[in-house]
Each structure stands twice: as structure tokens, then as C-alpha cells.
Amino acid sequence: MQIYLDMCCLQRPMDDQTYLRIHIEAEAILGILAWCEAGNADLLNSVALEYEIDHNPHPSRKAFVQEALSKSVFTVQATDSVEQRAQHFGKFGIKVLDSLHLACAVEAQADYFCTCDYRFLRRAKQMDTGRTKVVSPLELIEVIEP
């Protein structure tokens, strides 16, 4: 199983935990990362994630995400096909970087693309993403720990 976590997921454990939903999602993300680290699934990286890491002004968040992605097994490159998919997704109102993340996951044929950006999640679930299922962290936890 291959899992692609977008940047909002990867940074969720660093967000303000006083909000219940954020706390629960953060715990879910930590569980997903541990599950991948235990060898139960492959965590994917991408040039889009690396771009966002490079431009992150918060050292602690940057270090946390770099550590999480250091265990990834594959980095999706920005091929012509990825760029075309991203442009296609963008035509449906999905932001540029979000489109690129989704395109990277679909191109890599990830089993799951996970985001905690609920506006993006709603739009992405309406897209044709082939075998890649678009999920929230809580939906993904239900899959890996039924």
C-alpha cells in the first residue's frame, strides 16, 4: 500500500492542539506515520512536498516534516504527465500546489491521498483520480485499523 500525505497532513501534529478536531487529526497522522514506519505501507514523497519544505519559514515544522519524509520510499518527480494532471485538476478550482500534490499521488498510483484541508478534500473527491482514493486522516485510520 502506498500513501501520499499532503503538507497540511504532515504539519498537522505541529498545529494548535487546543481544538479537538485538530488534536484527533494530529493523533491520526502520527498513527499513520508510525504504521508506515513499521513497514505496513510506503510513504510517498514528491517534488511538491520538497518545494513546500524548502519554503517553510518555521524551523521546527520544517524539521518535523523532513524527519517524517526521510522514511519515504519514493519521490514523485514533476514529469510532463504530472504537470498535465495538475493543470487538469486546477481547472476545477483546486489551488496550484494542491493540484500538484494530487497529480503526484495519482501519477505514482498511490492507494491513498490524504489531506486535512476539507475544502480541497471535497473538491478532490469529485475528481477522477483512478485507483488513488482521496481521504481525510480519520478516513485513512479507519482503513488501516478497521
What are these regions (language model features)?
Residues 77, 96-99, 115:
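Short beta-strand scaffold positions
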Residues 4-57, 70, 75, 138-142:
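PIN/NYN-family metal-dependent endoribonuclease catalytic core
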Residues 51-55, 94, 119-120:
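Acidic, metal-coordinating catalytic cores used for nucleic-acid/nucleotide bond scission
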Residues 14-18, 81-90:
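Short, basic, glycine/proline-bearing loop/turn elements
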Residues 34-37, 65-69, 126-129:
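Short, conserved catalytic or adaptor-binding loops enriched in Gly and charged residues
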